[in-house]
Amino acid sequence: MKVDFLVIKVEKLSSLRVFYFFLFFFESKYVEDQKIKDAKLLQLDFDTIRLATNDFSPYNHLGEGGFGAVYKGVLDSGEEIAVKRLSMKSGQGDNEFVNEVSLVAKLQHRNLVRLLGFCFKGEERLLIYEFFKNTSLEKFIFDSDRRMILDWEKRYRIISGVARGLLYLHEDSHFKIIHRDMKASNVLLDDAMNPKIADFGMVKLFNTDQTSQTMFTSKVAGTYGYMAPEYAMSGQFSVKTDVFSFGVLVLEIIKGKKNNWSPEEQSSLFLLSYVWKCWREGEVLNIVDPSLIETRGLSDEIRKCIHIGLLCVQENPGSRPTMASIVRMLNANSFTLPRPLQPAFYSGVVDSSSRDNNHTRNPRIASLNDVTITELDPR
């Protein structure tokens, strides 16, 4: 392999430093070559995709994803596809694009969207995914009519599926991955309303020994309302960043309202603050979508999910459970959950007792949260 070597002065460098310099150079080049090699296996013809989307017609436009617009397409075989067209103003360069292709191509989980291929041509960058006619959870859960389709069984299946998908990304895949943009519009729904996590343009990889560590970035990317406070304000992120976003999503699914929603009589309270206020005052029924109460009542399963959601949105990342703990909580029939502390971005009256782990709980709250848990400490 022909390589243009850099001209450097090595007189003052130790032989060991020279060795590590060239080791890093060749290793980096190998990684990039391997990414491109993997990506070529999935490369599709641009004209094929252009025709499939009717030349990216506005009628085929499905919405906006991370870094670009998404279109519906139909291949000659009749297969329906979703095409993510990278915006030239998005800020996602070739490295990020190749990263998404090479990464997603290797991910195999029933709760992750499957990548079918990609395309490079000139300045065009396209990602081709499997298509879901139900589109995203956002189209259902925040629509007063379509939300009625989502009974509690479906909502619980969505919550559990997203939890398993994130656990796979954090701990079980070949790579260890932080999604960084977990939200309702990035959860697609198949014909049976099973959830599929989508949009991997903002993911970050980390080593196994970094799973409990915090990393930093000067380029904060994501969606406000779902961002953890430490990430939004300081660029600090970890697996607990995704956990926070998951908690927001869980509470949205249960209430059927966006995170920026506030009740008319309490316009200063957004969703997290409203849920916390109701929880503290023992008015848990007010947290739940009325359509669920009418058809199912306030079940232990619903109470458990509210409790888990509040544990996830705690201000301190160290207080939030891991996705492994969350999956265990969701699967357990008998579990005693730790008492959640005040959520991040709380806009109501601060109750100092909510920050005290030894404080005696309000008996009204305790009576609502008598789902028993044996594993108190998150892994």
Curated annotation (Swiss-Prot):
Residues involved in ATP binding: 62-70, 84
Protein kinase domain sequence ranges: 56-336
Catalytic activity reported: L-seryl-[protein] + ATP = O-phospho-L-seryl-[protein] + ADP + H(+); L-threonyl-[protein] + ATP = O-phospho-L-threonyl-[protein] + ADP + H(+)
Keyword match Chloroplast: no
Active site per database record: 181
Pfam family, one: PK_Tyr_Ser-Thr
Family: Belongs to the protein kinase superfamily. Ser/Thr protein kinase family. CRK subfamily.
Protein name as it appears in the record: Cysteine-rich receptor-like protein kinase 44
